[in-house]
């Protein structure tokens, strides 16, 4: 529907008291992204031309998240919580600027797909003034009911105001609504609060539109997709649903997840073809994995880019700023951070590589540590192509080990090592023949 302008109004003013958290509800994360981020990303993918977000009083943290995701979004404050229609009207200035379609949704509904938003919006192009999204939950208790007559939506009745016959309806209100821009403001302004809670319900838009002789319809979505998150339990349930989606998409794209239920992905994780992910691997935000990569068990990746043919793990941790070029091997109990490791290099055991550049085909022996922090600042380590770092070596940054250089085992390197040189930085071994025998004899003499 690129020929029609779309104003999206996202309601993000809820207190979220059931979350029992100091963090605003909509800033809690699902698959590495805030719920608000998920919703805004879906609306962008659905063709939003303008975005308005309604936040609670003083919620600059929520406003900052909005602007980070959609820099040109308009942010409005709902000073009093008097119902959903009242919240939408907090964005009056955006509504007055006009749009062909207006889409209202909630920032605590992170699982809705762009395709479903398109389905909800479609009736407006066909002439409807209002379209509501419905679903059939396993238990409808607590939900508003969609009262229909044929293809028409007659009313949305909140459960507290529903008759016995209406409570028997299983088709429930998901909360998302689309309104024709030409009628949106007029309808919203006439919504009253004559109901059990004394609030201004957005759902009353249906009956007002029909009273004007306009059409209202209902679209249908899966229950999992429109699940709202109001508690930690529901947050975990949303995580499980989204993780399953992400795992299925990864496998459909050509990645092998040996035990999918033990692999946790972020919403932006990219896995190439013929990637093999063994059990118990966590992908934090910002991870891109090329083709033919093998990730062994118990690895944690975040903010890392892996080119084709890389092997990592088991028990590897890749932190933000890690770049592994093709064919790199990262072994067990290795941690990297802000490190670029070029093609064919190996860091196979028990090492920390931070704020570093490692050249192609270099080999870092077991226990190699880049000492990058002096308590005040971070410093870089440069390791040239083909360099060989002996086991249990400490490279005290800032320092450079040249191409093809060797560093002897157990070294503490504090000065640059030239290309093709050998650096030895440890005390010479001293052997005292018979010393141990004499020591034991002295210790075993009776005390007198």
Swiss-Prot record:
Pfam families xrefs: Hexapep, NTP_transf_3
GO cellular component, one term: membrane
Gene3D superfamilies: Hexapeptide repeat proteins, Spore Coat Polysaccharide Biosynthesis Protein SpsA, Chain A
Sequence positions that bind Mg(2+): 108, 230
GO molecular function, one term: magnesium ion binding
Residues the entry annotates as binding UDP-N-acetyl-alpha-D-glucosamine: 11-14, 25, 78, 83-84, 144, 158, 173, 230, 319, 337, 352, 363
Residue numbers annotated as active site: 349 (proton acceptor)
GO BP, sorted A to Z: cell morphogenesis; cell wall organization; lipid A biosynthetic process; peptidoglycan biosynthetic process; regulation of cell shape; UDP-N-acetylglucosamine biosynthetic process
Enzyme class (EC, first level): transferase
Keyword annotations from UniProtKB, A to Z: Acyltransferase, Cell shape, Cell wall biogenesis/degradation, Cytoplasm, Magnesium, Metal-binding, Multifunctional enzyme, Nucleotidyltransferase, Peptidoglycan synthesis, Repeat, Transferase
EC numbers on record: 2.7.7.23, 2.3.1.157
Catalytic activity of the protein: alpha-D-glucosamine 1-phosphate + acetyl-CoA = N-acetyl-alpha-D-glucosamine 1-phosphate + CoA + H(+); N-acetyl-alpha-D-glucosamine 1-phosphate + UTP + H(+) = UDP-N-acetyl-alpha-D-glucosamine + diphosphate
Region (Pyrophosphorylase): 1-232
InterPro entries: Bifunctional_GlmU, GlmU-like, GlmU_C_LbH, Hexapep, Hexapep_transf_CS, MobA-like_NTP_Trfase, Nucleotide-diphossugar_trans, Trimer_LpxA-like_sf
Start and end residues of each stretch annotated as N-acetyltransferase: 254-448
UniProt pathway annotation: Nucleotide-sugar biosynthesis; UDP-N-acetyl-alpha-D-glucosamine biosynthesis; N-acetyl-alpha-D-glucosamine 1-phosphate from alpha-D-glucosamine 6-phosphate (route II): step 2/2; Nucleotide-sugar biosynthesis; UDP-N-acetyl-alpha-D-glucosamine biosynthesis; UDP-N-acetyl-alpha-D-glucosamine from N-acetyl-alpha-D-glucosamine 1-phosphate: step 1/1; Bacterial outer membrane biogenesis; LPS lipid A biosynthesis
Keyword Transmembrane helix recorded: no
Function, in words: Catalyzes the last two sequential reactions in the de novo biosynthetic pathway for UDP-N-acetylglucosamine (UDP-GlcNAc). The C-terminal domain catalyzes the transfer of acetyl group from acetyl coenzyme A to glucosamine-1-phosphate (GlcN-1-P) to produce N-acetylglucosamine-1-phosphate (GlcNAc-1-P), which is converted into UDP-GlcNAc by the transfer of uridine 5-monophosphate (from uridine 5-triphosphate), a reaction catalyzed by the N-terminal domain.
Family of the protein in this entry: In the N-terminal section; belongs to the N-acetylglucosamine-1-phosphate uridyltransferase family.
Protein name: Bifunctional protein GlmU
Organism: Xanthobacter autotrophicus (strain ATCC BAA-1158 / Py2)
